[in-house]
């Protein structure tokens, strides 16, 4: 290290090399020595502080400064560090060979010579790191670079820990619960990548030198097999495989070495490294004495650190040019990154581009969307960092989308006003289940509805209208303006022969190529498949791109509905109507066996593939036709067949999931809210029927009140008219109120004085026989609540009482044709409130479950609500206190209970 002060002005910044969790790496030239090439890591101060990355930057700087004191060929060297007002700068070795993972993806697997040579270099480098009291804690092929000659160089020490107390306190963490093993000082913080995490970190929340050796064993296996040994459908499954040693070479599996012979010595070496107990895991010194390295002279450092291209007389350029032109940034499917978060606001970066082949941080990758992860819940439970960041925070966030160029800011999955949009969507799916809709109806609405209603409406019309029709009519009376405008806008874009389906989220022309699953067939071909991974998909696309595009046959119209159902129709370009009218069901977004992959999918450039996989059933390669192909289709046909072409397909898939989750939450809320659906079901004792209620008018009866939790009925003395109240009617009788003789008799629709006795049969004959009132019934002064069902249920009566207490009794309006002006009635009731109302405790319960009208409750919020309010909860707060180990045990515990 030199003490001369440097600054960004001393360097010429070239192209961007990669993107890390909190930094961007550039190729740079020294202005004073142009022949010197460096890699400069630029860290945004604003982002570091915002994302709480100061700790990791300090760790990396201190660790690399310590290692740079004695330069080692296998360690990236730190030359200078400096900063300006906006950024921190790390001047590092330039590695023109790229990442080791990129080379592995190109080669598929390494032969025995390369495997032994790379492993020997890793062992020597790890021995040097451990000799300085440093644990890397995130060793994986992505964090190993290659120089021009093919030598390995370990990088990315942001997760490192040290047992040297001379370093920063954040860099070293000591565990007092040491078991006295050979790595007797361990770190107790959760870092690393899911597929390389050691079992002691999961089981005991400890990490030592043996954790790096475990990661080395995983890498040796990956060199030979092409993929890590432990790979689950999600992080929890991966962790379970790790602690169970569930991998092809594990003790419980029979090794099939006939198809592709593997050196048995390397199998034996991996089996001795991948051991659960740290005390039984072989050390680096024992690995060096293993028979697999019998021909390696560990004292001959020159031979060990000879580059692979150097030893074979090949240059880096010859090797890379000789490889097939396959995208090298393709990620292994289901490989999930645990610790990294995409950088977002580094000022010096002009064009955001993900770090090549970085897990969850690449633009040319297959991004896994396994529905069973839940996108947020599955990862949050494990303490993973990337999933806690919403996809809307930046258009280049690869947790949702991998190709940033394909999605402009106008097409982000959740726009800033997404909350209001979510409310509208939820109302469209189930408009009768949202409690906040009730208080919208105020006195003005009720007062205006009475004069418009004529008293002599024929009651026979109500009996001739079916229940289903009357309910929908009542619903449209409240929400018709917004619905009609929306339908007019949508139908205006369609052909006159077609009518739009409001349940369709998106519909457009695509190419679809389906490949069925066959257990005995090839791994992956155009005709069948029995295995899926990134290498197979990459090879298939590279060799059969035109066939998958299917551009010479016909187009399909792909339809995604709000119910989550995905289907398509064939649209033959020649005009064959037989295939066009047949609908083919593909899958439902809610299907737990459905996965979605993004292979360079870009809707703007119409390139790449959106891949859907139904587990052991079929794979669909979905691509978009070019604009020239679309121009051959008649304009009217395009207009009539495309819906919502302003929103991209990936966003619509996530929106469909969101709508389904919202519907599930609405179903949960409906079980605890006071809507008519929950209370319309019979329970014991049964509520008083409509036909029996007129007989009890004027008598004191005991009504049934529902508990807020499960809807059970309790006998409680209440006002005699509460059980028979229409929605938003006055819950009292003129006979029971003080001073009732001077009160207008129409205050209760069913309690009439002798002046109105003649109209009683006329009005009741029209209402009593029916289970659902018609539109005419509602316009007679009775505005429906919730789902506009009849008012015989107790749930609506309870809500009426809630509204009267919160807004005052003046919100209720009479509906009798002989009613005096509403102002008089309201003015008279104020000095004489109903006596039973102050005794009711329902408003407290309603506050517990209701939500503001502009907020949609997510499933996690709903569960937290009930967890915090449930005194008998089974959630163990002590277990899920810190780290991956705690999260793993907590999830294991919850899984056993299920």
Curated annotation (Swiss-Prot):
The active site is at residue 138. One of its GO terms (molecular function) is protein serine/threonine kinase activity. SUPFAM superfamilies: Protein kinase-like (PK-like) (SSF56112). Residues 11-293 form the Protein kinase domain. Residues 723-738 have a biased composition (Basic and acidic residues). PROSITE patterns: PROTEIN_KINASE_ATP, PROTEIN_KINASE_DOM, PROTEIN_KINASE_ST. The modification Phosphoserine is found at residues 696, 753, 871. Residues 435-484, 675-850 are annotated as: Disordered. It catalyses: L-seryl-[protein] + ATP = O-phospho-L-seryl-[protein] + ADP + H(+); L-threonyl-[protein] + ATP = O-phospho-L-threonyl-[protein] + ADP + H(+). ATP binds at residues 17-25, 41. InterPro entries: Kinase-like_dom_sf (IPR011009), PDPK1 (IPR039046), Prot_kinase_dom (IPR000719), Protein_kinase_ATP_BS (IPR017441), Ser/Thr_kinase_AS (IPR008271), Ser_Thr_kinase_AGC (IPR050236). Residues 469-483, 804-817 have a biased composition (Low complexity). It comes from the Eukaryota. GO terms for biological process: cell integrity MAPK cascade; intracellular signal transduction. Transmembrane segments: none annotated. Residues 459-468, 697-721, 740-758, 771-782, 789-803, 818-831 have a biased composition (Polar residues). Its EC number is 2.7.11.1. Keywords: ATP-binding, Kinase, Nucleotide-binding, Phosphoprotein, Serine/threonine-protein kinase, Transferase. Serine/threonine-protein kinase which may phosphorylate the same targets substrates as PKH1 and PKH2, 2 upstream activators of PKC1. Belongs to the protein kinase superfamily. Ser/Thr protein kinase family. PANTHER family: SERINE/THREONINE-PROTEIN KINASE, SERINE_THREONINE-PROTEIN KINASE PKH3. This is Serine/threonine-protein kinase PKH3. It comes from Saccharomyces cerevisiae (strain ATCC 204508 / S288c). The gene is PKH3.
